[in-house]
Design a protein with these regions (language model features):
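Mid-domain alpha/beta scaffold segments of enzyme catalytic cores
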Residues: 1-277
């Protein structure tokens, strides 16, 4: 498979990389400089807890091309919400999101969503997600969505609480019909390491069936390693490898994959690039 270092002629965007995680503390600055040299022109760092937001704002202000989003991930609800009093805390969460999202480097709301894989409270998860959707609607920002084993529930909420700017279904895994439903609601599909595994037939078929305009690339680093890199820290410099896998899967030129997915991301997140307007 083509490596990232060989793809200097193309520009890329990683729409989902947890670059603030401690996994990158030892080499973050050098790694970002290396990524920029190989053509990664922008990255979106999704927030998972409010405690992260100030640090993410500082990080993005200090480095060109880094952007972030603010959100409360369904797997981290317990870090912010009281199990008994959470209903009374929703307005505080909404206020915190509204305030934090005013930062110029904040380009989306999320990572938020539904996760029925974990032992969580679905009512609580739906209420928190609805809070995020309402904030995104008010601020006219896109949403970065997390979903595991809850697509029917998520689609129901997206239909009842529409978001004009749409967003991304991060790490999409599902059928072509499911993908089309999200795309019809204005949500792009996040394409990452999953497509590098031949056993992921359903997802690979879905990604092949959608128009390229519906797709954005992501690594989800340091998680979601590509095939052949299991057990290693995933890294944003593997975005070109994701792009190469997508080109092979769709039998399309790599240049078209890079150009269109980058354009999709720049337009969706309004990343202030002239060619995205």
């Amino acid at each position: 498979m083509t490596t990232g270092i060989e793809q200097q002629d193309f520009n890329w965007v990683d729409t989902h990389c947890h670059f603030d995680f401690e996994d990158f503390d030892e080499d973050r600055e050098a790694l970002w400089q290396s990524c920029q040299r190989m053509g990664l022109e922008a990255m979106v760092i999704p927030g998972v807890t409010p405690d992260q937001w100030p640090r993410m704002a500082q990080m993005c202000a200090a480095a060109e091309g880094l952007h972030y989003s603010v959100g409360l991930h369904p797997c981290w609800l317990h870090t912010y919400l009281d199990p008994k009093l959470w209903r009374t805390q929703l307005q505080g969460l909404a206020d915190a999101l509204l305030q934090a999202a005013k930062d110029s480097h904040c380009v989306a709301i999320g990572e938020c969503g539904l996760d029925l894989y974990i032992d969580g409270d679905l009512e609580q998860q739906e209420a928190v997600l609805t809070c995020h959707l309402q904030v995104a609607r008010e601020l006219e920002q896109p949403v970065i969505l997390h979903c595991r084993r809850a697509h029917n529930e998520l689609l129901r909420l997206l239909k009842s609480h529409p978001v004009p700017r749409g967003g991304v279904v991060h790490a999409f895994s599902g059928s072509a019909e499911l993908a089309r439903q999200y795309w019809s609601l204005g949500f792009h599909l996040g394409v990452g390491g999953t497509i590098t595994y031949e056993r992921a037939n359903k997802t690979r078929n879905a990604i092949s069936a959608l128009p390229l305009e519906a797709l954005v690339l992501e690594t989800d680093a340091p998680d979601m390693p590509l095939c052949g890199h299991q057990g290693q820290r995933n890294s944003p410099d593997r975005i070109p490898q994701v792009g190469a896998a997508l080109a092979q899967l769709r039998a399309e030129p790599l240049e078209r994959i890079a150009t269109q997915t980058t354009r999709n991301a720049l337009q969706l997140f309004r990343l202030n690039h002239d060619d995205a307007r």
